[in-house]
Swiss-Prot record:
GO biological process: post-embryonic development; reproductive structure development
Superkingdom, taxonomy of origin: Eukaryota
Any one Gene Ontology cellular component term annotated for this protein: membrane
Annotated spans, Polar: 2-20
Protein name in the entry: Oleosin-B1
Function as written in the Swiss-Prot or TrEMBL entry: Many of the major pollen coat proteins are derived from endoproteolytic cleavage of oleosin-like proteins.
Membrane-topology annotation of the record: Multi-pass membrane protein
Family per record: Belongs to the oleosin family.
PANTHER family to which the protein is assigned, alphabetical: OLEOSIN
Tissues and organs where the protein is expressed, per its UniProt entry: The full-length protein is found in the tapetal lipid bodies of immature anthers, the proteolytically cleaved C-terminal product is found on the coats of pollen grains. Highest expression is in microspores entering and undergoing mitosis. No expression is observed in male-sterile plants, green tissues or roots.
Localisation per UniProt entry: Lipid droplet; Membrane
Segments for region (Disordered): 137-157
Length: 157
């Protein structure tokens, strides 16, 4: 039974622990008082302004609905614009076979982060070990890249 029950050690309260308890009690009382005053003020303001909300509800409800619709419309327009810019850049790349001018990429990065062309691959890091005195063989020359064939022009409308 001695293992399950631990003996409580009695000790005398020090001045520091008594002072800490008194200050903590005062702080908790002050915070509780501030909380009560805040709750009472909120309830009083709610009671005082409720008639105004009832009287002006024919104006406030449509204004809230209009604000919501305007916000939704602006968000939809922004999304459609960003999508249009992305599609135009994709068409430009497909038609010309080259990247769009850097100005468009900068604008696109501001509109849609991460949607602009991916950066070119960085060169590989140098090996950690010291290089050999002389390479065993010379690296093979890279074949010249052939230009991409241009697609046929779309028919005129």
């Amino acid at each position: 039974m001695g293992i399950l029950r631990k003996k409580k050690h009695e000790r005398n309260a020090s001045f520091k622990s008594v002072l800490t308890s008194i200050l903590a009690t005062q702080a908790a009382t002050f915070l509780l008082l501030i909380s009560g005053v805040s709750l009472a003020g909120t309830a009083a303001a709610f009671i005082a302004t409720m008639p105004l909300f009832v009287v002006f509800s024919p104006i406030l409800v449509p204004a809230g609905i209009t604000t919501g619709l305007l916000t939704t419309g602006l968000a939809a327009a922004g999304g459609a614009g960003a999508t249009a810019v992305t599609i135009i850049l994709w068409l430009y790349k497909r038609a010309t076979g080259k990247e769009p001018p850097a100005v468009l990429s900068k604008v696109l990065k501001k509109i849609i982060p991460g949607a602009a062309a991916a950066p070119r691959a960085a060169p590989a890091a140098a090996p950690a070990a010291a290089p050999a005195a002389a390479p065993a063989a010379a690296p093979a020359p890279k074949p010249a890249a052939a230009p991409a064939p241009k697609p046929a022009a779309p028919p005129a409308l």
